[in-house]
C-alpha cells in the first residue's frame, strides 16, 4: 500500500493539481501530516465527496472549519497518533531519498543543552515554531 501521488503545497497550485490527478473529483484519501491550520482546511476542502481525511499532524493553534462540508461531502475524518516501528523506518527511508523539503519542516536546530530553552519558546509561541530538531553529535 502506498500513495499514488504527492503534491508539494509550496511549489504547486494544489487545487489545480488535485483536479488534474483525479479528473475533477478530488482525492479519495488525504493524509494531513503537517499540522498546519492551512493544510487541515485544505484537506477538508479538497477531498472528494465521501472521501476520507486522515489527521496525523498536530496543530498547535486552533483550526476553524465550515462544518457544512463534513455533512455535505459525507466525509470520514479520522485521527491517529500511534505509529509502528515499520512506520518510522519508512519515514527514515523517505527522508534519506532527499525528496522531502526538510529545511521547511524544521524551525530551529539546537544542541541538547539548548533544548530546554527551545522547548520553552515553542510552548510560549506554538503558532510560530513548527518543529525543533535536537542534534546530537
What are these model-predicted stretches?
Residues 41-45, 85-137:
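C-terminal hydrophobic helical "lid"/dimerization subdomain
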Residues 51-52, 75:
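Glycine-centered, small-residue-biased loops immediately flanking beta-strands
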Residues 47-49:
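Helix-to-beta-strand junctions that scaffold the AdoMet/dcAdoMet cofactor pocket
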Residues 57-74, 86-93:
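Rossmann-fold NAD(P)-binding glycine/threonine-rich loop
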Residues 1-42:
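Adenosine-nucleotide cofactor-binding segment
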Residues 10-14, 57-61, 82-83:
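Short, acidic/turn-prone active-site loops that include or flank metal/cofactor-
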